[in-house]
Amino acid sequence: MKKKLIREQRSLSRKYENIKKGGSTQKRNIQKQRLKIQKLHHRIDSIRTDYINKTIAEIVKTKPSYITIEDLNVSGMMKNRHLSKAVASQKFYEFRSKLLAKCKENGIELRIVDRWYPSSKTCHCCKNIKKDLKLSDRLFRCDCGYIEDRDFNAALNLRDATTYEVA
C-alpha cells in the first residue's frame, strides 16, 4: 500500500514538474491525481485504525484483571528524525485512549508505568539492572544465566512492576 502511495505521489510530482517546464498537463488531471492520493491516505489510515481496534478487542477478550502499559515519551521520539515517521504511523495516543475506554467499559484496571522504569534493562529472574544495554542488543543476557528476547523480558518486568499509576 505504501509503495502504491509513493508511486502516485511521484506521478503527481511529475505533473507539477511538467507544468513548471512549460508542458501541457491539465489541471483536471492534477485534481484527479490528488484525489487518488487522498483516497490512499484514507485507506492506509483506516487499515491502521482497524488494526488498533482488533488488537484492543483481542486483548480485552482474554479478560485480564489488569493491563500494564508504559508511559512513552512520544513527543521526544518524534524529535528523532529516524524514528518520527514510524512513531507517527503507529498512533500511540489513539491506541492508549481506546484501550483506556475499553478497560473502563469492561472493568479492567489499566496500569501505567513511568517512562523511566528500567523495564528493558532489568533481569526478570534476579532483578539485576544492566546499565550498558544498547537498543541494538535484541537478546537480554544476564550474568545469572538468564537469556531472553529483550521485549519479552521488558513485558515480564512491566507485568510485575510495583510502581505504577492507575488510569
Predicted regions and their residues:
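Positively charged, helix-rich recognition surfaces that bind polyanionic ligands
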Residues: 1-167
